[in-house]
Every structure is written in C-alpha cells, then in structure tokens.
Amino acid sequence: NKTADGVINAKDYVSEELKLGMANAKVSTTNVAISIPVTSAIIRVVTSPLMSDDELQKAIETDSLWENLVQLTDDLNEYSIFHQVISRNNKTNTMEILFVASKLSDVNAYSSIVKKAGLNPVILDVKCFTLKNAFDNSFKIENKANNALLEIGSEDNYLIIVHDNIPIITDIFLRPNEKDLLGQFDGNIQNTDTESVVRRYCMPLK
C-alpha cells in the first residue's frame, strides 16, 4: 500500500492516480473541492462573551479573541482558521463559536498534490464536515438528532454527532491490526481478538 504512511508522504503517487482517475472517468472540469483529515485540524466549540458580528471581526483581526479562547501550542500565523457562530444567548450574555484551525503546511501539501494532477482546488474543508454536508444533502431525514457519522480510515478514526447544531467529535484510537479486524467484521464475532477489539472500540462511542 503506497499510501500506508499517509497521502502527504506519497505525493507523486497520489497525483498520478488522480490524473488517471480523472482521465478514466472522462471528467472535464478542473475545479475541485478537497478535504483534509481531521488529524490535520484542531476543532473546538468555544464559549465567548456575546458580541455583534462587527465586534467579533475586530476581535479576530487583533488576534486577541483566539489567543484568549483557544490555547494553541504554535503561532496562530501557522494556521488557516475558520469560524462560525453557532448560537447566541442573550440571557447568559454568551455565544458558542465553532473554531477550526488547519496547519498551513498541511493545507499547502494537499493543495500541491491536487495542482500537480492538473486540477484547481477552489474549496478546502475538513473531512468530517465534508462528510456531514454530503450526508445532509443525500439523506432527507427529518430528525437528524439520532444520527451519527463514523469513519475508520488510514488517517482518521472518529465519531461525529451533531447536537443542537453543535458538532461533537470523538477521536477513536485504533492500532493498524485492529483496523484490519474491524474491516473484516460482519456482525458475528468469530474469535476472541475480534471480540476484544469490538468491545474496546465501542467504549468511547457510548
């Protein structure tokens, strides 16, 4: 598996495969949307004093808002930051903000892979939100409160639940051999190794 160590470590291979896939599918457009792994992003819902949109923008421009609300180990300038006001509460004089920070080095690396394949990245999003949007657009379910999205992959393993419009993301640690066992799991526990993985895997989901 040439991408076993991650897509970024197999740039040339992935670019060539993208070219081949686009040619085989006879896709003519070159504008594409790409998603980066959850592991390349910092996702938090933070509580802030209630502000208007103008006040929020001014606080962001001075860098004071994120420095006070989000303690990052690296310089803010090393991240591409997206934010969205989720809710405002006049009674408590607070508001909830979705904060998403992606390492610029990772953003540039994934963009370069796509560009090398002759494509033009026009939209970039974190994969968990891309999957959620695809789910929302594909399945017209009235009550989405009882639904969750689960991903097990080479780079990401997480569960995402949206409660009161707030995304709750739980990372799940799995060893490579455990991913293989779960990938083969068909609902019937056939051996003690599989049973052990399934039981441990289910614990963070409860």
Predicted regions and their residues:
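Hydrophobic/aromatic-enriched cytosolic interaction surfaces used to assemble or bind macromolecules
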Residues: 1-206
